[in-house]
Each structure stands twice: as C-alpha cells, then as structure tokens.
Design a protein with these regions (language model features):
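Short, compositionally biased
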Residues: 1-135, 152, 177-180, 291-292, ...
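Short basic/aromatic-enriched segments
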Residues: 287
Length: 319
C-alpha cells in the first residue's frame, strides 16, 4: 500500500470484471475527452535523479521505443464518465461495495481511518457521484477529473469508448512532452507557491493546508509539449500494466506492456495530496500501484488509442 492512496479493503466478488455490454453498445460510446496524437519515438524511461523510492522500482533508466498513439489531453472528466454511465448503466466498484476512501479534510461524513494512513477515511456512500461522501455532489465539477474509479471501472469505460488504458511506457513518454530526462512535465524546476504549475498539497501535510484541498479543473495549468494537461498532481491515473518493482530490469525495449503476472496495477502522475514531506511521486518517472478494485478520492484515469490521423503530429523537440 502507498501512503499516497489507500489500498482497497478485501471485497467479496472483487475478482469479477465489470460488465458494460448491457445495451449492446460495446465500443460505440462517444468519448467526450479531447485526444492528441503522439508520434513514434525513443526515450529514456525511469528516474535519472535517484529520487525515487526503492520499492517503487523506478530504475534502471532504460531506453524505450514506442509506436505512435493518441492519448487524452486530460484525465477523463466527471461529464465524460457521466455520459458513459448514462449509456450503459454501469455501477462502479465503490457504489457496489458501499463506499470509498476520502481524504479527511474534505470528507462529509465520519469514516474509519485506514490503518497506517489515518488521513484516509473509509467513508460509506462515497463514490464518483459523491466524491467527498454523502451529501456531496458533482455541482461545479463537470470539468474535474472523475475519481473513486477502480482499475476495472476505468477499463469498462475504455471498452465502451473503444479506447484503452495507457501502458506505463506510453504514459511516461506522453507526460514528458518531449523533454529528455526532466523531473516534471514542464522541466526540472519544482513548483512553488508563486508558480504552482500543478495541483498538489500545500502547507503542513496532512492537517494544515494553506489553501484549498481537492481536485481542480483538468485544464487548470499549461499543457506540456505534447499538449497534455496535469500529468503531475491532481489525480493518480491508472495504467494498463501490472506492477513489478523489478520490471525495469527485464522490460522489452519496444512497446513494453508490463509483466505478465501480478495482481496490482500501475498508477502514475501523483495527485492533489502529494507533498514533498512524505510523497514526491508527482515526478514524471514516479511509479505507484494499487489493487485493481481500489478506489479513492484522488484516483482517476485517461485513455489512449490508435494515432489520430486527422490531427497534425506534435513536435517532439527536446528543450
């Protein structure tokens, strides 16, 4: 379990995949998130600064070659996910199992503290529709990233939309925006109060924030060189790959897709709860993972697909 997002409790039926074929519309959904083409290329994947956690397996740095693909410019929004649910009747894991993990400062109801990470509360009734818990709504949050979605919920959306979750390599390549070996999507300079650049926790974590705590609209900050927004902070994003801390030692060079075995799935990007005092996983090389049924108020996703030939390719100039 990571301190950044709690592991989901053991749940009956947790090995069953969500079904999205209720209306015979598999693969036909209107994907309401803008996509951009990322050209084929080669990049150095992994932590070149020695700043990662040993158990996350961010090293060794290794060369990866990828074919072209398209990727969402933003995380999937509440509006886009609502369209999917309206079309399919999909019920998320958090709704099925009766609740989800909510950060304590904005939870609308009491909850049981998650062992080892007491700032996380298991709140009955929390879900994508009620992101802070009972009584909370999506009013004003249409353009915020959907949260409280499990890996299986994200995959169900992808199946409906004819998309896929990005491989970990696709995610990092796109997040780097053409910058070779940089710490962040924008370069090496850390965010500051005067130039925040990303949505992370500011103040004394976890009890004394100096500003609002929570998600922000998906286009709050400037995009990176590939046109992607908020690849650092805001919400963790599910990837397709299974997780192994040893995988970088044996990874394929071309279009790697992760280990063949393993129960946990990769998460990338950090969230609005990252803070350098305990978690600096909002770097582009940072890795995390969780069980596929896990949900929390800082976990979302974006999708990939074949290269969109209707769009002009974006430059990969290194700066």
């Amino acid at each position: 379990m990571s301190c950044c997002h709690p592991r989901g409790p053991a749940r009956d039926g947790a090995d069953e995949s969500p079904t999205v074929e209720q209306n015979g519309i598999l693969g036909s959904g209107p994907h309401l998130v803008e996509t951009v083409s990322v050209p084929a290329g080669v990049f150095d994947m992994g932590d070149a600064f020695g700043e990662g956690y040993r158990t996350d397996g961010e090293t060794p740095v290794h060369e990866v070659e990828l074919n072209a693909f398209s990727i969402d410019t933003t995380a999937v929004t509440n509006a886009a996910f609502a369209s999917f649910v309206a079309a399919t009747g999909h019920r998320t894991d958090a709704e099925t199992f009766g609740g989800s993990a909510v950060f304590h400062t904005y939870a609308t109801a009491p909850g049981q503290a998650v062992p080892g990470t007491p700032w996380w509360l298991a709140v009955d009734g929390a879900s994508w529709r009620h992101p802070a818990g009972p009584g909370s709504t999506l009013d004003g949050l249409a353009d915020h990233p959907v949260v409280h979605v499990s890996h299986r919920d994200a995959q169900a959306y992808c199946d409906w939309a004819g998309r896929a979750l990005p491989t970990e390599a696709q995610w990092e390549y796109a997040a780097r925006g053409g910058r070779r070996g940089a710490r962040y999507p924008w370069g090496d300079e850390p965010p500051t109060a005067d130039d925040p650049r990303c949505t992370i926790f500011r103040g004394d974590f976890p009890n004394e924030p100096t500003g609002p705590v929570g998600t922000t609209p998906v286009r709050t900050f400037e995009p990176n060189g590939h046109g992607l927004y908020q690849c650092a902070g805001n919400v963790w994003e599910w990837c397709a790959d299974r997780f192994s801390a040893r995988y970088y030692r044996v990874s394929d060079r071309t279009d790697p897709s992760g280990p063949a075995r393993g129960s946990a799935r990769v998460l990338r990007g950090g969230s609005h709860l990252c803070h350098d005092s305990y978690c600096h996983r909002y770097r582009v090389a940072a890795r995390s993972h969780n069980t596929p049924e896990s949900t929390a108020s800082n976990i979302g996703f974006r999708t990939v697909g074949p290269r969109d030939t209707r769009r002009e390719p974006i430059s990969t100039a290194v700066s």
